[in-house]
Amino acid sequence: MMAGSTTTTTAAVRVRGAGRAFAGRQVLRGVDLDIAPGEFVALLGASGSGKSTLLRAIGGLDRGFTGTLEAPRSKAIVFQEHRLIPWISVWRNVVLGVRGRDLAARARTALDEVGLSAEADAWPATLSGGEAQRVALARALVRHPDLLLLDEPFGALDALTRLKAQALVARLWQQHRPAVLLVTHDVEEALLLADRALVLRDGRIAESFDITVTRPRSVVDPEFSALRRRLLLALGVDPDAPTGAQS
């Protein structure tokens, strides 16, 4: 059984020997993973490799695992779908499930951090896709998580909105410094945001890349380009192929 969510003094997340099978198919096989407090880790791999499965385990959303897991009690998850409730206002979505006083003020503070304080009383249906994802980020931030789990949060956004959302996440991470696990298919996104990029292959963490490129990062930086090439090769993608072949 997976161990209950607990805090650890040496790592924000500690996974040992995690395994998961669905209908007889082994998706994860003895995964080991450590994420330090305040570290930003990106997890990449082919579709169906188990990236989101591992994230859900760390988030406490799936108990059908073998192995052991330690993670902070204070954690929040942002999915690709914003999952806002349409019949309550934006600010009430932000603090849904949060206890304590001054919830409206706390919601507005979180919305201000993502540039949406003016939309606090709006209905979710009036928001663009990018705005809705920013509300989802505010909903995570208002909980002051020690661990932020991002499951392809920009996957449904257009290219320009995606770049703006990436920059926002980078800024918010630098401000609040939670540990972050980002599941993504986008190599450049991983290299722009993370301290470390992991490749999940055959049910295990097959490769790990330390990203030492100075922030803020640029895709035209030669060091960035060299690391991008190595990471694409690790993912089984030809880095010299046309861009469309890498998506």
Swiss-Prot record:
Nucleotide-binding as UniProt keyword: yes
Protein residues bound to ATP: 45-52
Location(s) in or outside the cell: Cell membrane
GO CC aspect terms: plasma membrane
Enzyme Commission number(s) from the entry: 7.6.2.14
A GO term for molecular function: ATP binding
Protein's UniProt keywords contain Endoplasmic reticulum: no
Ranges where the ABC transporter domain occurs: 13-227
Enzyme class: translocase
A family per Pfam: ABC_tran
PROSITE patterns to which the protein is assigned, alphabetical: ABC_TRANSPORTER_1 (PS00211), ABC_TRANSPORTER_2 (PS50893), SSUB (PS51291)
Catalytic activity: ATP + H2O + aliphatic sulfonate-[sulfonate-binding protein]Side 1 = ADP + phosphate + aliphatic sulfonateSide 2 + [sulfonate-binding protein]Side 1
UniProt topology in membrane: Peripheral membrane protein
InterPro entries for this protein: AAA+_ATPase (IPR003593), ABC_transporter-like_ATP-bd (IPR003439), ABC_transporter-like_CS (IPR017871), ABC_transporter_ATP-bind (IPR050166), P-loop_NTPase (IPR027417)
Keywords (A to Z) from UniProt: ATP-binding, Cell membrane, Membrane, Nucleotide-binding, Translocase, Transport
Family: Belongs to the ABC transporter superfamily. Aliphatic sulfonates importer (TC 3.A.1.17.2) family.
Function: Part of the ABC transporter complex SsuABC involved in aliphatic sulfonates import. Responsible for energy coupling to the transport system.
Assembly with partners or alone: The complex is composed of two ATP-binding proteins (SsuB), two transmembrane proteins (SsuC) and a solute-binding protein (SsuA).
Name this polypeptide is given: Aliphatic sulfonates import ATP-binding protein SsuB 3
